[in-house]
């Protein structure tokens, strides 16, 4: 017995038997797991499976000469393998799905999608595994870019966009010939909401077919710079020509036409509402001795931001000078108070002779009724006054008056009616009342004619001004205001 125990092989065998007995004893308390046919009795590593979605597809082809359509952007991939390998693949996605078309020519082909860089121990299935592609020759063409505004109705009140400035104006579009031929619109969009000043932005270029569908093409550059000038509220107004200097002897103005006859002014709405016309368009008559085209600057009124155009052309036609005398032109009254009477002391006839000078054409058309001779008695108190004689009439005519001033007497209507009882004074008062009514009517007519003359087609708003002369014999020349 001692000899048996001293044998080392015997001890090893006994130890192995005890180990087997211990293993059986430990596992005897657990329900046995049924084994599949062919499965080893000893434990093995577990397997797993997962489906990954939206895996990108890489296309390999000659992209310098060809364009390929039909390759899906993404696919679904199912991976199988050990739990650790599947877990790692799900996290890293370090494999690649691709379509190899480098050996294919133009036309339609069925291409198998493949995977590479797959870890050992993994199997991969791709859905879809086959795709139909079309290969066409690559074409590049230049197209202009159109700018589309949106939210234009939401701009600040009175503001509006002008023509956009695009840089670059054209882009290079590359794609298959069929797609290039179907291009209907190349545009970039600009949002105008709340705009009240010039907009500068970069915008993406999008390409559409005739049905409004975006096309899969390459655009170079894909982003362009757009500048949109934004204008403030505006309105068109006429302008008045202010004549300075004197025409050379024997020369008269036959006609003046302006091009354009109106200009556009830009500014706040309050400024525009108060602006009816523009003054100060100057014309120097001393420099005119023949038919001429003169460029004149339009002055910028207070509060106006811009005028367009800033210059106008005045086309001036000249002629020889003719004259005509009109006798006993009646003097009308402007600005007479309803509580006053007026009496002309000198001239007592309330009329003087007037000589008109101008081109033969204008003088031949002139009638006595065209001449508006008047005195302005606004704000004058009762008593005797020497008031200036003024004249309005057709444009391009100058006037010579027999005198500079008229002597008048203003009286209150109340004092006249309370102190005069005899028939001659009563008759005189009736005549005065009649004269006053006539003068009131003349005042209204003069005011109307003055407004009419201030809005002539050349917008020449200069009122005739009489030159100082001797009261009895001197002659006053004034330039007529335009109708």
UniProtKB/Swiss-Prot annotation:
Q: Does the keyword Transmembrane apply?
A: yes
Q: Which UniProt keywords apply?
A: Cell membrane, Membrane, Repeat, Transmembrane, Transmembrane helix
Give start-end positions of Low complexity composition bias.
413-430
Q: Where is this region: Disordered?
A: 410-483
* Membrane topology designation: Single-pass membrane protein
**What InterPro entries does the annotation carry?**
c-di-AMP_regulator, YbbR
Q: What is its main location?
A: membrane
Q: Which residues cross the membrane?
A: 9-26
Keyword presence, Membrane = yes
| GO process annotations (BP) | positive regulation of adenylate cyclase activity
| Limits of the YbbR-like domain | 55-135, 143-228, 237-316, 329-394
Q: Name one Pfam family in it.
A: YbbR
Induction details? Constitutively expressed, part of the cdaA-cdaR-glmM-glmS operon.
GO cellular component term of the entry, any: plasma membrane
Q: What happens when the gene is disrupted?
A: No visible phenotype.
Bias class Basic and acidic residues marks the residues at 431-454
Q: Where in the cell is it found?
A: Cell membrane
**Cited function:** Upon coexpression in E.coli stimulates the diadenylate cyclase activity of CdaA about 20-fold. In B.subtilis c-di-AMP is a second messenger that mediates growth, DNA repair and cell wall homeostasis; it is toxic when present in excess.
Tell me the subunit arrangement.
Answer: Interacts with CdaA.
Record protein name field: CdaA regulatory protein CdaR
Q: Which organism is it from?
A: Bacillus subtilis (strain 168)
Which taxonomic lineage is given here? Bacteria, Bacillati, Bacillota, Bacilli, Bacillales
Instruction: Write the gene name.
Output: cdaR
